[in-house]
Curated annotation (Swiss-Prot):
Belongs to the terpene synthase family. The keyword Magnesium applies. InterPro entries: Isoprenoid_synthase_dom_sf. The keyword Kinase does not apply. Keywords: Magnesium, Metal-binding. GO terms for molecular function: metal ion binding. Disulfide bonds: none annotated. It comes from the Eukaryota. This is Sesquiterpene synthase-like protein Agr11.
Length: 355
């Protein structure tokens, strides 16, 4: 069976870019995260981390951030480990771990309590390293740090709910699913890390057009390792008469509207040249230049997600480049083809669909 995938970013203005320090950052971050992986997973479980796909995503997403790119890789590796680990624990344990991580980041300068969970220790270490990315003379570092921790808490709380839903076999409506996945995908954290070197004031981050662009980005980041949290599964569950191809066609139509909305908001973004005050001053360019870099980072992040899905073997095996070029996805049959089998095969081969 063949499915034609929608070319969601056909008119996207941002081309593929890879951080030139990718190889070194990947090696450094892999060595950094390995002790945690070894503590949490057995030999079989550790195989999921051998290829370090997350460092490629970080290097595609933060292609312009040349300063210590390994810290971006660290973030993605840490939360990938967290996500994989909470997939196999109870909702109660997931909730407890979320509290441990947030507390570790809020109190990163304090000694860890005796018997601290290794995820808490690693979160504390990550946060100490990540904050070195903030400009030494920045005026908005506290705003940036507070925003990142709040987004971390939002993400971890959502992952806890996801664990509960998985435990109870819950399948959401499309609207509920999109709202949930904007949090569980960690999209806000990805964007918050773009801000770290830009020293953007609160007035910019709370501007309605900037927030609209951030919201649109989060709609493109829909991925999961569980069939109940796959958008195509949700669409077909809500529309029992819809074929698999019809579900992808629905996705293509929805995504086209999202892309157009992003482009419209970029065109309507006002100038920040006249904004003044201590919080707007920086040694790294005018406020308008820094805002432009941030918006470019949003666009690049969307492109990175799409490129990454096809360039790793995680979703399409060795067929990624061919699938990207032809847009044809082959769903391999099982002995007895059922709707459930098709969705499970689809989840393995195309779990990086765009919402």
């Amino acid at each position: 069976m063949q499915i034609i995938l929608p070319d969601i970013l056909q008119t996207w203005a941002y081309a593929r870019l890879l951080n030139p320090h990718y190889d070194g950052a990947k090696l450094e971050s892999s060595l950094w995260i390995h002790p945690l992986v070894a503590k949490l997973f057995d030999q079989k479980g550790q195989k999921a981390f051998q290829n370090d796909y997350t460092s490629l995503l970080a290097s595609l997403m933060y292609s312009h951030q040349g300063k210590v790119p390994s810290r971006r890789c660290d973030m993605m590796n840490l939360f990938f480990v967290y996500d994989e680990y909470t997939d196999v624990v109870s909702p109660e344990i997931a909730h407890r771990l979320s509290k441990i991580v947030v507390d570790a980041m809020k109190n990163s300068d304090e000694m860890s309590p005796c018997g601290e969970h290794p995820i808490g220790d690693k979160a504390k270490e990550f946060w100490r390293l990540a904050t070195t990315l903030l400009p030494a003379t920045g005026s908005n570092s506290d705003v940036c740090k507070s925003r990142f921790i709040n987004l971390t808490e939002e993400y971890l709380n959502a992952v806890t709910v996801e664990a509960r839903d998985r435990n109870e076999g819950t399948i959401h409506s499309v609207k509920e699913y999109l709202t949930m996945r904007r949090a569980t995908s960690g999209a806000g954290l990805m964007l918050a890390l773009i801000e770290f070197e830009l020293d953007l004031p609160k007035a910019v981050l709370e501007h309605k057009f900037v927030q609209a662009l951030e919201e649109i980005y989060t709609r493109t980041r829909v991925s999961s390792g569980q069939a109940n949290h796959n958008l195509i599964t949700v669409v077909m569950h809500e529309n029992p008469g819809l074929s698999l191809q019809g579900a992808f066609d629905w996705l293509g139509s929805y995504a086209a509207g999202v892309v157009e909305c992003f482009q419209t908001n970029v065109r309507n973004l006002p100038s920040f040249c006249d904004v003044e005050g201590p919080a707007c001053e920086s040694v790294d360019g005018t406020l308008q230049e820094r805002v432009d870099k941030y918006i470019s980072g949003l666009g690049q992040a969307v492109r990175a997600e799409d490129d990454w899905a096809f360039e790793t073997t995680r979703y399409y095996g060795e067929d990624g480049p061919k699938v990207r070029e032809t847009r044809v996805l082959v769903i391999r049959p099982v002995k007895r083809i059922t709707r459930r089998h098709l969705l499970q095969s689809l989840e393995i081969k195309y779990s990086m669909v765009r919402g």
